[in-house]
């Protein structure tokens, strides 16, 4: 067999080099071995020394000053989570290891003097505390991050808290739970060492009954150490260019590898060291409930019946035989079973639908991804009793849904062929796909691969055979509840650069994803791995593509495989009940290292056999990542870039002027300078010059306000076009797109849909428009109009109308036709039959789709000219319009308005905001149904606004647009 037909590799791009360099290469090649022997590739491990001063960023504004707060005597609170569980809150203190060494009194003594320490934020990082306490300025503002020393990542820190033992614990066992420490933690309770923890994502669970005082204060102290390899951060500037991606931090494996700095985040000075997740006390008896595993199975294609299987690990932590009862309750179900445990024995109690008729659900409320149905959740309560005493309780939520997948594979018995499989139906606890032996398909230059199978896999028993005639070819397809899901994906590079991840802070971001019609979020390199992330994904209908903590395969890899696997195993066990998690992936843009790959695959097959483990985020049943910047010829999105499944595609995303002022000082707002570069304005890459030419095609920008306004026109269209390109080939080649990125980790100029402050600039509304569940669009280059229906419902007798308007608002062409629109499919309409020479110099093309009852379902506007970008200055000829806003009605928290253009001028790119009357500040987050819309003379548009519950009640609604400045409407 020829190498180009059957080439197996861990590193396709390296093998291509070998292919052209060698006359004969064996069919089965392990590229990593060859790299070690040939020295063809040196893995990236970051900077070896700091940049020179001239390459550092410099601004006109001084760093902001900070004033250290006086330390307060804050009492500890035990906040109840359940009747048997408390979060240890407040009262935490932070000091350096040097301060402890210099003290004459033991840190474990209640009399230890912490006057010169800091009131600590737990959960939180060291830097979060130091910024909160006024030691350092806000690192997100300007160049303030440069004022914070990198030595924070080279220091050990002590966390300390005093608390009283809960009265409810009398006669019971008390357990101490750490949900996450980065990177190492040495735990002491009342002077006695409890344990060491290592890795940011493993929990520490300890029986501390014998360590606690029944009366008086307990002292809990934790010595926290940063990652072993903090590396040297590259500082972005106009001279230094964009950030270098990671480096030595990747050696540490289970940590926040991006915190050393990337091309979208600066080096975080403490590398997110600290007790970054909460600490809890739990009381109970001798039997402890572990991490349950819930498997839901549908009798597809029938979705009216579901079987729920619940496996519950329980462990006897005593030296005595124990007898008891385990109960499980959720909506409409209440079951129990007896158990017996020998001393220190652990076993799994299984509630099987074969034995419990209650677990055979009729008409279950299914969990669906956003846009395909409601993300319904069930709420499970588990309780282990010993006699009449409750020994342990656990509450969690789960969803009834079934995941399956389509992809192409290669086997010796059968060449490249397409299959579908449902992991839960296989459920044999063994890996299926051999990612150490993958096969190049198609053009070798494109490096695309498909997996082979392990030799013990019975293909006929595992897979449904699909037709190779399906135009989606080798590409990955997700199914939920038997329905193909067209992936509209976003990416969290990191939830927050300082790991401030409260529900209050994070939930609006998920709400914005839902409103923009996303149905998947990629947890890039596992940087956002925490309970709240998955809980919000469950609640908002977001599938999760979950990476582990490794980046591209040209970067150094973890030193300690055992530590990596320990953290990964705990993550899988801990979060496997979340219906949102759709896929596990070992790393970003690469395969797991040899030696780790089989262990990781085996662990996932054992601990979570209901989900697909996908060996690589690019190339494997997918295309290459990118591009990442402005594409001046939008046709390329349709004719070249839109193909298959892409996990990374993005562009510049400039904030509004109001947002820019939140993180850049007035002195540095204009022109573009080092401060902009530090905040990810990549002026040397990603077609930056083309982007600037496009912005200035509306006329040279001479201020930050002009630049931001014109940039919104470009970013709206760019992000819309990249998605519409993929839309244009729905299920006829493309199966999904994951944007790089949808979420910013800090104030940024690129790779985001919304901005850090919850503002929704042009990029957001461009994405929201293109991802509408029912969407009408005009393709390039032929102007064909199509309807995209990414729902489970079909619609008959829909009317699609296209109209061409001059910049004066005069209609000069129109055409309508009726169409039946199938579910989860693309419907071709027509190409407008207007000759090029009949086009006005600059035209507003409006597509309008109505349902059979005349209700508008989708409106989509395009600016079209014979001269392309060169004609954008025509918009500057349009005079200022006059708008009127009328409140129609209120439905709960939703306010309904009618916006009307009462002038004879076009209103271009109209965006509404809410302004606090008292402070004059823009109120965020708020949720408008539309943004950057065009209003024809006399046109009315219905809009909705939803304000968060805590928002102000005395506000104005303001509007701004391309051809007018901000005005108060109401």
Per-range role (PLM):
Residues 22-30:
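C-terminal segment of classical bacterial N-terminal signal peptides
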């Amino acid at each position: 067999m020829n190498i180009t037909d059957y080439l197996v590799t861990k590193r396709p791009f390296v093998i291509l080099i070998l292919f052209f360099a060698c006359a004969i290469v064996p069919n089965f090649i392990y590229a990593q071995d060859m790299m070690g022997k040939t020295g063809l590739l040196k893995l990236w491990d970051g900077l070896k020394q700091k940049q020179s001063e001239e390459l550092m960023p410099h601004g006109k504004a001084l760093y902001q000053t900070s004033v250290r707060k006086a330390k307060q005597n804050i009492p500890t609170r035990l906040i109840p989570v359940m009747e048997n569980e408390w979060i240890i809150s407040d009262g935490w203190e932070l000091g350096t290891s040097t301060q402890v060494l210099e003290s004459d009194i033991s840190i474990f003594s209640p009399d230890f003097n912490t006057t010169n320490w800091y009131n600590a934020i737990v959960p939180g990082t060291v830097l979060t505390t130091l910024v909160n306490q006024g030691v350092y300025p806000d690192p997100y503002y300007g160049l303030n991050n440069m004022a914070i020393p990198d030595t924070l990542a080279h220091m050990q820190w002590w966390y300390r808290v005093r608390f009283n033992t809960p009265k409810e614990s009398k006669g019971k066992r008390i357990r101490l739970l750490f949900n996450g420490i980065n990177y190492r933690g040495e735990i002491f309770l009342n002077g006695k060492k409890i344990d060491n923890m290592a890795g940011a994502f493993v929990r520490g669970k300890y029986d501390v009954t014998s360590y606690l005082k029944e009366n008086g204060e307990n002292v809990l102290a934790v010595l926290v150490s940063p990652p072993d390899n903090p590396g040297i951060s590259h500082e972005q500037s106009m001279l230094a260019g964009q950030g270098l991606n990671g480096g030595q931090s990747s050696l540490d494996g289970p940590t926040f590898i991006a915190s050393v700095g990337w091309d979208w985040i600066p080096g975080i000075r403490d590398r997110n060291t600290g007790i970054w997740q909460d600490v809890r006390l739990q009381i109970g008896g001798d039997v402890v409930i572990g991490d349950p595993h819930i498997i839901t199975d549908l009798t597809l294609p029938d979705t009216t019946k579901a079987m729920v299987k619940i496996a519950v690990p329980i462990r006897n932590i005593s030296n005595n035989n124990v007898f008891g009862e385990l109960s499980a309750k959720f909506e409409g179900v209440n079951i129990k079973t007896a158990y017996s445990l020998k001393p220190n024995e652990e076993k799994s109690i299984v509630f099987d639908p074969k034995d419990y008729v209650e677990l055979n659900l009729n008409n279950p409320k299914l969990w669906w991804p956003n846009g395909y149905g409601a993300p319904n959740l069930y709420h499970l309560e588990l309780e282990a009793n010993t006699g009449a005493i409750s020994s342990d309780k656990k509450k969690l939520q789960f969803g009834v849904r079934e995941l399956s997948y389509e992809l192409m594979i290669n086997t010796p018995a059968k060449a490249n062929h397409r299959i579908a499989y449902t992991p839960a139906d296989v459920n044999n606890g063994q890996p299926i796909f051999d990612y150490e032996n993958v096969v190049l398909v198609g053009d070798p230059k494109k490096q695309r691969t498909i997996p082979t199978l392990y030799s013990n896999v019975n293909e006929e028993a595992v897979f449904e055979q699909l037709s190779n005639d399906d135009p989606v070819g080798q590409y990955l397809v997700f199914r939920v509840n038997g329905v193909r899901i067209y992936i509209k994906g976003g990416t969290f590079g990191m939830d927050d650069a300082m790991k401030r991840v409260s529900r209050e802070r994070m939930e609006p971001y998920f709400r914005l994803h839902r409103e923009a019609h996303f149905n998947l979020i990629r947890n890039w390199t596992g940087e956002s791995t925490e309970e709240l992330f998955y809980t919000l994904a469950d609640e908002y209908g977001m599938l999760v593509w979950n990476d582990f903590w490794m980046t591209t395969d040209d970067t150094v890899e973890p030193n300690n495989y055992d530590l990596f696997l320990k953290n990964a195993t705990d993550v899988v066990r801990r979060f496997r009940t979340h219906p949102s998690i759709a896929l596990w992936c070992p790393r970003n843009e690469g395969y797991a290292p040899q030696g780790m790959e089989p262990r990781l695959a085996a662990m996932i097959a054992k601990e979570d056999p209901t989900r697909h483990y996908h060996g690589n985020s690019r190339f494997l049943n997918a295309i290459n990542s990118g591009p990442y910047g402005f594409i001046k010829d939008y046709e390329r999105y349709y004719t070249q870039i839109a193909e298959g499944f892409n996990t990374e595609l993005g562009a510049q995303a400039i904030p509004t002027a109001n947002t820019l002022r939140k993180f850049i000082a007035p002195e540095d707002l204009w022109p573009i300078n080092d401060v902009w570069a530090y905040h990810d304005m990549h002026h040397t890459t990603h077609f930056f010059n083309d982007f600037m030419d496009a912005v200035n095609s509306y006329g040279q920008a001479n201020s930050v306000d002009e630049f931001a306004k014109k940039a919104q026109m470009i970013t709206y269209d760019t992000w819309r076009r990249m998605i519409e390109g993929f839309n244009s080939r729905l299920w006829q080649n493309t199966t999904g797109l994951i944007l790089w990125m949808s979420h910013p980790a800090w104030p940024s100029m690129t790779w985001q849909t919304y901005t850090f402050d919850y503002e929704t600039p042009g990029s957001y509304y461009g994405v929201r428009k293109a991802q509408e569940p029912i969407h009408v669009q005009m393709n390039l280059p032929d102007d064909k109009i199509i309807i995209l229906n990414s729902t489970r419902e079909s619609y008959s007798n829909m009317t699609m109308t296209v109209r061409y308007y001059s910049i004066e608002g005069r209609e000069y062409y129109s055409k309508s036709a009726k169409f039946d629109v199938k579910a989860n499919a693309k419907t071709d309409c027509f190409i407008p039959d207007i000759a090029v020479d009949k086009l006005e110099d600059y035209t507003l093309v409006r597509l309008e789709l109505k349902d059979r009852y005349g209700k508008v379902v989708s409106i989509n506007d395009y600016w079209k000219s014979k001269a392309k970008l060169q004609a954008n200055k025509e918009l500057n000829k349009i005079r200022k319009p006059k708008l009127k806003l009328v409140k129609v009605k209120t439905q709960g928290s939703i306010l309904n308005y009618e916006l009307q253009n009462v002038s004879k001028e076009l209103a271009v790119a109209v965006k509404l905001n809410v302004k606090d009357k008292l402070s004059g500040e823009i109120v965020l987050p708020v949720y408008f149904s539309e943004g950057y819309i065009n209003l024809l003379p006399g046109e009315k548009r219905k809009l909705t606004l939803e304000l968060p519950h805590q928002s102000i009640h005395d506000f104005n609604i303001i509007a701004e647009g391309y051809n007018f400045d901000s005005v108060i409407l109401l």
